[in-house]
Amino acid sequence: MKTIHVTASREYDVVIGAGLLNECGQRIAAAVPGAEKAVVYTDTTVFPLYAKRVTDSLKAAGFTVLQDYFLAGEHSKTFRNWERILRFFTENRVSRSDVVVALGGGVVGDMVGFAAACYQRGVRLVQIPTTLLAAVDSSVGGKTAVDLPAGKNLIGAFWQPSLVICDTDTLQTLPDAVRRDGCAEIIKYGVLDGTALFSRLENSLPDEIPEDILARCVEIKRDIVAADEFDTGARHLLNLGHTAAHAAELLSDYSLSHGSAVAMGLCSMARACAARGLCTEEDAARIEALIKKCGLPTELPYTAEALANAALSDKKRAGSTLPVITVEGLGRCTVRKIAASDYAGWLRQGGAK
């Protein structure tokens, strides 16, 4: 078992290990003293798999447990469903001293976390990620959001959890496509961290993802969040590959998975940086080869103009400038502010038509 301590506006632990769902109640009780009710919110995929195990553990720890779920998938991450969660809180007289438990993947964590952030100006939150992507990325760092028709994660808040529990048993039976999605974010961390981690990933992905690799990804995010909790500068590094990814997701009406989009965006940026002499062709080729090895796509399916136009809705844009995260070598990534009108050129150099 690994425990990573996060220091932000709220300090908390990220606990990673096998069999943690069975003991989650006691851990949650220790993290949120005084809470009487625990509201477990999940989706239609996770509910039949893990909800009973979590609720039984919470009841054994003395909580009064409420539970609800919504339809799985990015299309559920809407203002309407977020409002439905808030109505559930009010109908069941949840108080600020209680705790909300987000049990599931990134969509669950984002939307339930945003509801917790807003309800009565903030109720305590515990994240229990059940996908690889959520475990290494979205459950940590406090970003919560829902989507709008104009773009991804355009309404949201920073709301740090009180605890993150990652039971690695839930990651062993993921469908291949969901596992691949998580590999995309892990590769991103390898590029950010450097040759040592990236070389390990080349040897282990996609078949083996040891606990210490999960922990290292969380540590990387922890350190970046500690330096820039509210995403005004250094935290943009975590968006490596994500500007093109979010644009592609929007253009696909969210039929394209987040991990697939990140893989495409990461390949595109690595190629563009190699073309501009910012990184070596060898580094770009290694990134693309690892993405292919994991069974992830490497080519953006939309034109550079369409992607650049969609990127104008990106929440990181500041007026006429758009921050892009460039690859200048493994372990050497930089936030560069470019004219939004120049972004199509980067995309073309990355392979978009």
PLM-predicted stretches and their roles:
Residues 93-95, 118-119, 147-148, 155-158, ...:
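Solvent-exposed alpha-helices and their adjacent loops that cap or buttress functional pockets
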Residues 107-114, 135-136, 247:
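Short glycine/serine/threonine-rich phosphate/pyrophosphate-binding segments
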Residues 1-98:
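ATP/NTP phosphate-donor binding region
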Residues 160-164, 169-176, 184-196, 203-206, ...:
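Generic secondary-structure signature for well-ordered alpha-helical cores
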Residues 199-306:
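Active-site segments that bind and position negatively charged phosphate/pyrophosphate groups
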Residues 15, 114-205:
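A glycine/threonine-rich phosphate-anchoring loop and its flanking beta-alpha core
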Residues 184-187, 278-353:
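C-terminal charged capping/lid subdomain of soluble metabolic enzymes
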